[in-house]
């Protein structure tokens, strides 16, 4: 028997395998690029190490690529065989159960396994990170905060990677709307480790949600030198910087960040793609000519047409296909989502309830015979309080909040738009875009004085 760097038992007699696995976990917590190298080293030292095999399966799932789903299942079988031959701790058996649940699309059952682990082993960083991930896509900020609140008392500054846990807590609080606690925790984590990009991004979310664009730009500028050696999550953090400049109307800067930072090269990573697609959609709403950028995204989207693994990603693939006029490919995506919606897992239910209608509305807005804003509004308006089921953060999902507001305005449904935009400007008072659109709605309702006041706030 051996132990990882948190003191948790690992079923292996190889010290080299245990050390490599610990390095893998450290790298995973820190968004390092050598995580896979360390995992391969662990398996090279002990090819039957159950936790290494299970972790390999987890990582295959995190890519959300169909060809890797089979490899995740293969990893689970190998781990099962290793456990049958060697035995395993209850913690490792729970991890195997989580992977097996994920293999059949039952992300909720997988999350339950990780939460069970954390009740007994609150220092299991893999269970912490993965439950954080699945709560993010399934249950939202409240569940994220509850999960981290359960484990946080077991951590202190003397324990390795305490700062990373503080960063996870920060983002959980932010998504639950507790911005004061989120900002304090995130800045505390960054003070411990300036390379903590998850904590950096948690604070960036606070600035985004509160409309503190100048502070957000300064925050990210001060920390961006720390990201050079980190994995592709750094692109998402650059995306946050672009969001501030977008709100300030600095569209040339947004395009510079798009081309030079978060979409410098086409990527098949779904997070990279969603950064790019959502930003182009927002730029289109501001009347910005994005050139051939949609076409490049549509090429990537076509490669993933039919994936139907993560509905959040599929909804962004539809943006690119529809905007670039690839209607046949867009219909193929709808068909694949409809087929996926017949399944039994959480993502099947999300696809049926939210993903399919959102994709249909997106397509309606881009039909070659003219934008059908009214049809899109009819689809999106009843869904506005259910979009959270797609997963993603408040900031990411805001593209669909913008979509329903813009569809209502373009369809001439100014009273409906007025209500939604009143709500929007009340919760995000420093949003010039929100105030401009609110002015448009008020003007359409015949409230010239109100429109003028809204435009003043947008200035």
Placement of each model-derived feature along the sequence:
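Residue at a conserved register position within TPR or TPR-like alpha-solenoid repeats
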Residues: 27, 60, 101, 135-138, ...
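Generic helix N-cap/helix-start motif at coil->alpha-helix transitions
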Residues: 15-20, 50, 88-94, 122-128, ...
